[in-house]
UniProtKB/Swiss-Prot annotation:
Subunit and interaction comment: P0 forms a pentameric complex by interaction with dimers of P1 and P2.
Name of the protein in question: Putative ribosomal protein uL10-like
Family: Belongs to the universal ribosomal protein uL10 family.
Covalent link (Glycyl lysine isopeptide (Lys-Gly) (interchain with G-Cter in SUMO2)) residue numbers: 297
CDD domains, alphabetized: Ribosomal_P0_L10e (cd05795)
Length: 317
């Protein structure tokens, strides 16, 4: 079958990306740095039936989206995020589930000299199994060691590389000698596009409990500000009513003015002993039946033992 020319390929690519943007209401913009063709094939196979992965040149993706803005203006939000080595992951499934599947398809990778570290690398304290001739190599990296049974032992954990640092040749060589693969590469979600809205992938970590607690925190903050400024809102009115009632009650106690709800408070302040005396009486009334029941149980037990003896069921008979 003859290979299609470049113009036909471009036309088909534009049609494909437009069709996917229309058919799928949700997608991820993903970074594909350090992802090889073999790993990309594995990702496509593991997510088959759930997602469609589309890669391509940024200029072509932007051109296709700009040409479709008249039909779908919300797609304009995607344009500022199409830069670098990126692609699209289209889906109709739950976004959190697909995110977890993408994370599961990351593969460990060795450190390469000149690469930018995506995470912090710490070498743990351990016996390296390397001979004493490598001691100068560790000293050059500032790693404290000792010779133990003819091999080099690292005495404490060492932060070798910081996030964002360029991996040096010495660091890469050391990690390879220790068989440490500190990095993991895969498709990295940079932005989430969901029914016309675009947001950071961290939003997917928000649970209903988190949203509920944040909402209540906001309500408390609004109520506090409104109470301090005297501006009534639904959040602050209940507190304003309670505070007002407390002030009226305090005024009633200090003056001759009274109302039914204040009578009990005034009576308590006038004679607290009357309320204290009521508690022991209630306790005595509940304790009396229990005390009366105890002798009755003892008497019943004694009668039962006597009847057993009368019937001749003694232990040594």
């Amino acid at each position: 079958m003859p290979r299609e020319d470049r113009a036909t390929w471009k036309s088909n690519y534009f049609l494909k990306i437009i069709q996917l943007l229309d058919d799928y209401p949700k997608c991820f913009i993903v970074g594909a740095d350090n992802v090889g063709s073999k790993q990309m094939q594995q990702i496509r196979m593991s997510l088959r039936g759930k997602v469609v992965v589309l890669m391509g040149k940024n200029t072509m993706m932007r051109k296709a989206i700009r040409g479709h803005l008249e039909n779908n203006p919300a797609l304009e939000k995607l344009l500022p995020h199409i830069w670098g080595n990126v692609g699209f992951v289209f889906t109709k499934e739950d976004l959190t589930e697909i995110r977890d599947m993408l994370l599961a398809n990351k593969v460990p990778a060795a450190a390469r000299a000149g690469a930018i570290a995506p995470c912090e690398v710490t070498v743990p304290a351990q016996n390296t199994g390397l001979g004493p001739e490598k001691t100068s190599f560790f000293q050059a990296l500032g790693i404290t060691t000792k010779i133990s049974r003819g091999t080099i032992e690292i005495l404490s954990d060492v932060q070798l590389i910081k996030t964002g640092d360029k991996v040096g040749a010495s660091e890469a060589t050391l990690l390879n000698m220790l068989n440490i693969s500190p990095f993991s590469f895969g498709l990295v979600i940079q932005q989430v596009f969901d029914n016309g809205s675009i947001y950071n992938p961290e939003v997917l970590d928000k649970t209903e409990e988190t949203l509920h607690s944040r909402f209540l925190e906001g309500v408390r903050n609004v109520a506090s500000v409104c109470l301090q400024t005297g501006y009534p809102t639904v959040a602050s009115v209940p507190h304003s009513i309670i505070n007002g009632y407390k002030r009226v009650l305090a005024l009633s106690v200090e003056t001759d003015y009274t109302f039914p709800l204040a009578e009990n408070v005034k009576a308590f302040l006038a004679d607290p002993s009357a309320f204290v005396a009521a508690a022991p009486v209630a306790a005595d009334t509940t304790a009396a039946p229990a005390a009366a029941a105890a002798p009755a149980k003892v008497e019943a037990k004694e009668e039962s033992e006597e009847s057993d003896e009368d019937m001749g069921f003694g232990l040594f008979d």
